[in-house]
Amino acid sequence: MKKRNNNSFDRAKSVAFTGHRYYDFSRKEIIRQRLSRAIVVAYDNGIRNFISGFATGIDLMAAQTVQSLKLSHPGMVLTAAIPFRGQAGRFKPHDRRCYDELIEKADEVIVLSEHYYPRCFLDRDEFMVCNAAQIIAYYDGRERGGTYYTIRKAREMGISVTNLY
C-alpha cells in the first residue's frame, strides 16, 4: 500500500467520516441509507473528496458507500487516511477482505506512519479533521474514544459536524 496520487486536495471540498467500530447491526441498512443521503447532500454542496480512516465499522461502511456512489457522481474521490502500514492486520477476515478491496479502489491512499505507535489513531483522526470542511459522523454521545475525540476536535476548530445517529 502506498500513496498512489501525489495530489493535494482542497480542504473546502473535503469531508471526513468518523464513527464507531461497533454498532447495532440490525440498523446497518438504515445507517447505510443515512450515509448515502449525507454524502449526496455534501456532493450537491460542492464536496468532492471523501476521507475515510478505513477502520472497521462505520469507516469501512462510509468508504463502501462513497465507492458505490462514484459512478453516478462525477469527480467524487475516495481518500483513505491510514494511520499506519498494516492497519488491517488484526481485522476479522470479512473486514480484511472489504478493506483490501476498498484500498485498491481508493483514489488516494495516505499512510501516515510506517509503524504502529500509541497515538497513531488519534493522529489519523486529527489529520482528517485538519483536512476537511465538514465531518459526517455516526456518534452515540459517549464521551470517550476516537469518535468523541474527532468530533470534539472538529467543533473546537469550528468545523461542521453532521451526526447520523
State where each predicted segment sits.
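Acidic/glycine-enriched connector segments
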Residues: 2-165
